[in-house]
Amino acid sequence: MERWWFNSMLFKKEFECRCGLNKSTESLGSIENASEGDEPDIKDRTKNIQSWGGRDDSSYSKVDHLFVVKDIRNFISDDTFLVKDSNGDNFSIYFDIENQIFEIDNNHSFRSELKNTYWNSSYLNNGSTSEDTYYNHYMYDTQYSWNNHINSCIDSYLQSQIWIETSIVSGGDNYSDSYIYSSICGESRNNSEGEVSDIQTHVKGSDFTIIESSNDLDVTQKYRHLWVQCENCYGLNYKKFLKSKMNICEQCGYHLKMNSSERIELSIDPGTWDPMDEDMASLDPIEFHSEEEPYKDRIDSYQKKTGLTEAVQTGIGQLNGIPVAVGVMDFQFMGGSMGSVVGEKITRLIEYATKELLPLIIVCASGGARMQEGSLSLMQMAKISSALYDYQSNKKLFYVSILTSPTTGGVTASFGMLGDIIIAEPNAYIAFAGKRVIEQTLNTTVPEGSQAAEYLFQKGLFDLIVPRNLLKSVLSELFKFHAFVPLNQNETEH
């Protein structure tokens, strides 16, 4: 594979890139005039370029002049970024779009070579000038020390985080958008010693392998009582403020998981929540045999862990003054699996809403039917659907289904998709069978992102994608449109 190596520092202003090219002097001529409209032949240049694998300190000895690349997408396929954290520790980040690798390395020789290149650059020696004011400011003013040069280039990115957003060419005309985000913790990094761990992350429809020092994971675990790590961008969110931000990542806007109590607090007016059937719990109806933890013991452990009796909370409350019947599933309780108790509680909620002529909201978050209860869990699909038929078709009442991540299995195949209005959260994972199950069963590859809310919305699977901060107002408007009014307004009219 042909590889290009760049050491790039991002400017805050206009995101210009200052790059040092690791090249062979035999394959590359002068690059003083490299610009957006005047690009050398990439294929000829790559013949003698050093590869990342099996490198030693001398592999960086051919770093050449610093220059400006204004249109990075037409210039590189593999990228190495030189960065420094808040403690002053330097390391490089290698990004290979073709092999889908994102690697963090602590080799300090790279910085030394680039530093020498900076001071020995032909631009400085020749005293030439450029039309680029930013380039002049950072490159020609020799009163700036090397450290000031680095700090000016990276600035706020290296104090707390790195955010690189660019388009990169991979060996042809196909462009691949890459969004790379990495938190820099306040702990000092060691020199690439110790074990290495692989982490899979989802980046704009692609899976990249992040190879990171195990020390970073230790730091995350050490401060997990203070911070919540985003599962999408791996950014850290201060736990104390996360609840007030509705569990939405401050860095990338990803909707993190919420438990059922938090969702009730988000949507229902304070002081109006009246729970139903709180004491109903499963008694292991088929005496499910398990070689590991018995089913009843597992139920007990989840009850202690979550403070709930089952994987759903049901009750009556008010949404902006409008009385509603609400059921909220909790994925933290056995993956939100639907057993006999979950099905019974939801059925009773629907029957109560039918009797009292209330609008109905069910928030879905489930892995599907609970296997420990066998066919009893499967029959809940038909039981709930039957109750909904009477509610919707006979009584002509209004049911809103809200699909959160993940919503799969029997819930998707029953009441999850029976709403008069079906709303999904952004980036929600919605499917009947999971990706792994499909691939192992059918021996075929499931396209990346084909089970995401945005893709399914384009296919017409549901009606709306609504962020959490707008959900309550959207629900309120929907209910008013269907002639459900707040209690105080109803009393005034009568």
Swiss-Prot record:
The keyword Zinc-finger applies. Its cofactor is Zn(2+). GO terms for cellular component: acetyl-CoA carboxylase complex; chloroplast stroma. InterPro entries: AcCoA_carboxyl_beta, Acetyl_CoA_COase_Trfase_b_su, ClpP/crotonase-like_dom_sf, COA_CT_N. Residues 226-494 form the CoA carboxyltransferase N-terminal domain. Its EC number is 2.1.3.15. GO terms for biological process: fatty acid biosynthetic process; malonyl-CoA biosynthetic process. Binds 1 zinc ion per subunit. Zn(2+) binds at C230, C233, C249, C252. Keywords: ATP-binding, Chloroplast, Fatty acid biosynthesis, Fatty acid metabolism, Lipid biosynthesis, Lipid metabolism, Metal-binding, Nucleotide-binding, Plastid, Transferase, Zinc, Zinc-finger. PROSITE patterns: COA_CT_NTER (PS50980). A zinc finger (C4-type) spans 230-252. GO terms for molecular function: acetyl-CoA carboxylase activity; ATP binding; carboxyl- or carbamoyltransferase activity; zinc ion binding. Acetyl-CoA carboxylase is a heterohexamer composed of biotin carboxyl carrier protein, biotin carboxylase and 2 subunits each of ACCase subunit alpha and ACCase plastid-coded subunit beta (accD). NCBIfam families: accD. HAMAP family: AcetylCoA_CT_beta. Belongs to the AccD/PCCB family. Component of the acetyl coenzyme A carboxylase (ACC) complex. Biotin carboxylase (BC) catalyzes the carboxylation of biotin on its carrier protein (BCCP) and then the CO(2) group is transferred by the transcarboxylase to acetyl-CoA to form malonyl-CoA. This is Acetyl-coenzyme A carboxylase carboxyl transferase subunit beta, chloroplastic. It comes from Coffea arabica.
